[in-house]
C-alpha cells in the first residue's frame, strides 16, 4: 500500500554507495520523513549489510526536505488499534534497530538540517558525529499525546546534566542546534549553507577513521554561543523543580517559581504540562528515573514493554486519544482517561513496567559479538505465535 502523499515509485529510504561511503537518505518529505514500518525495515537492512561489508568505511544519514525526521508515523498506530498487536512487529524492529545504531561498529555521521523529534532523533543523537544547523529543531513530545519517551531516550535523557532530562521528556520543550551541541546531544554546529559542501567532502574522504572525519567536520563547524534566553540558562530552576519526587510536586514547584521576576517563561510550559496526558506524564517520569540506573539494553527492553502495554490500552487509551486530537481530528482537545494526576493509580503505572511472564516475548538484545545481528523479529517468540 502506498503511503499517503508518497509517489509509489519513490523509495522511502534511499541507500547509495559512493566509493567507501554509504549515504542513507530518509525520503518522505511530505510527511516530514516520519518513520514508517518500511523505513525501519530498510534502515536495519542497510546498516547490517554495511557493517559486514569490508568496502564500507563511513555511513552518512540525512533527510529530504525541511525535516530530518519528525519521529514515528502516529497514524499507523492510530489506524491499527482495532487489530490486536498490529504494530508489534514495527515496534520490535525499531527498538532492535536503536540498539544497533547505538553500538554500530563503523563511523556514522548524521546531517540534521531541520526537524528531529522523538524516534527520528534516535537516528541522530547516538551517532559518532551528529551535525546540526540553525534550522535544527529537537523535541521529545510523547507525553503530550499519552505516549512515553522511547527509542532509547529514557537512556539518553537520564544522562543529561542535572534534571534536564526530566524537563525535556515531560514538557516536550524544543532545543535548537546550538543547544544540542552545548549538552552533548550533537557534536558539531555547521551553518546550513555549508552543509552540502561538508557532505561532498565527507563523501570524497575514502576514510572512516574517526579522527579524520572529525577534523573534516571541524573545517566547516562553528563554536556555539547560547542565546541569552536559552532554556539551558535556566538549569538551576529546572533542577530545583524537576528533581521533585512526583509529577504533581514538579508542577507545584514550577508554579511557585513562575511567580518570581524573570520567570515568565515558565507559565506557558506549565500550561503545556497541564494539557498533557496525566498517565503519560507519570509513565515518562518513572521511565527517566529508572533509566539512570539502567543499561542501554535494559532501557530499550523496558521501553518495548511500555509501548506494547500502551498500544494494548492496558491501563489507559490515552495514546489513541492524543493522536486523534493531534493528527486525526486536529481539535487539540483530548479527553484523557483518567483526567487528572490524582485519579491515575500508581499501582497501575507500576504494572506496565513489569517484566513479561515469558522471557521469549521480551525484546531480544544481542549482547555478544557472536550473536551481533541476532535477536531479529523473525526469530522472536512473537513471530512464531503470529506466523
UniProtKB/Swiss-Prot annotation:
- Keyword Hydrolase listed? The answer is yes
Q: Which organism is it from?
A: Arabidopsis thaliana
Q: Provide the Gene Ontology terms for cellular component.
A: cytosol; extracellular region
Belongs to which family? Belongs to the enoyl-CoA hydratase/isomerase family.
Q: What is this protein called?
A: 3-hydroxyisobutyryl-CoA hydrolase-like protein 5
Q: Which residues carry this modification: N-acetylalanine?
A: 2
GO MF annotations, alphabetized: 3-hydroxyisobutyryl-CoA hydrolase activity
Report the EC number(s), separated by commas if there are several. 3.1.2.-
Keyword match Cell membrane? no
| Keyword line | Acetylation, Hydrolase
